[in-house]
């Protein structure tokens, strides 16, 4: 017979980790289920060395450091953590029965903090791309590229941020198919004032190498036949990620474009199931780590009140505990 938990959190990224910690402050019995092999979500797996800019009070905080601090914070409590375990169904009985790829769990409430779901990078679609060993989609140790010629493809926050990071240690070129970047204004200004070589509006058109090591990248100006060739040692593709919410559509929750619709309590269309972070939707929702961290206490406190209506939604402040 499965143990009965007060709160089961689906997702072990930053928002899920903080929700678990806060649930312990309310003395809830809580567990975490995550489909990934490690805690931390995208910041830990995809951006361990990228600076996280939207966590207040922590300048120069990397994805790995954020993850480690949240895990350290949670380690003060006994929290069962189930990794490599995918949630298949959530069935409302007397309690909630969660069926996963490895078994089943019973819980009084559920907080879904699964971010954008399963994710994989959008690939560079050029002939022969699969064979090149120096084409990368994420950075695990930036220092190994010191002094190398680096070219980055993309125009969003990740591409701009990585260009600024690489500029400190390597000759860096950024290629984007549009004149304007889809990144924070402050970052774009820093890019324009940096030593990064900016190629816009250009798109990659041909890979030049021996099939294993890429030596040059041909780029073509958009709506033109003009071409240029870039010498490089490493090519980083930052075209964003394809995400999949998997079985979410089968859980009987109201959705808005694959996001869970929630009310002001962070509660879904099913009473007792809450959603926080990038997986939830409400009018005016902003997808930031900081936003999700703020949503976590709202979901936890309302889950506590759902379990026991005599428990106040507004708890004591942590400074008075």
From Swiss-Prot:
Top-level EC class: oxidoreductase
Reactions listed under catalytic activity: 2 reduced [2Fe-2S]-[ferredoxin] + NADP(+) + H(+) = 2 oxidized [2Fe-2S]-[ferredoxin] + NADPH
Positions contributing to FAD binding: 34, 42, 47, 87, 119, 278, 319
Keyword Flavoprotein: yes
GO MF annotation list: ferredoxin-NADP+ reductase activity; flavin adenine dinucleotide binding; NADP binding
Stored Pfam families: Pyr_redox_2
Gene3D superfamilies with a match to the protein in the record: FAD/NAD(P)-binding domain
InterPro entries: FAD/NAD-bd_sf, FAD/NAD-binding_dom, Fd--NADP_Rdtase_type_2, Ferredoxin-NADP_redctase_2
Names of required cofactors: FAD
Source superkingdom: Bacteria
Keyword Oxidoreductase: yes
EC nos: 1.18.1.2
Cofactor note (record): Binds 1 FAD per subunit.
Keywords for the protein's UniProt record, in alphabetical order: FAD, Flavoprotein, NADP, Oxidoreductase
PANTHER family: THIOREDOXIN REDUCTASE 1-RELATED-RELATED
Complex and partners: Homodimer.
Family from the record: Belongs to the ferredoxin--NADP reductase type 2 family.
Name of this protein: Ferredoxin--NADP reductase
Organism, as annotated: Streptococcus pneumoniae serotype 4 (strain ATCC BAA-334 / TIGR4)
Upper classification of the organism: Bacteria, Bacillati, Bacillota, Bacilli, Lactobacillales
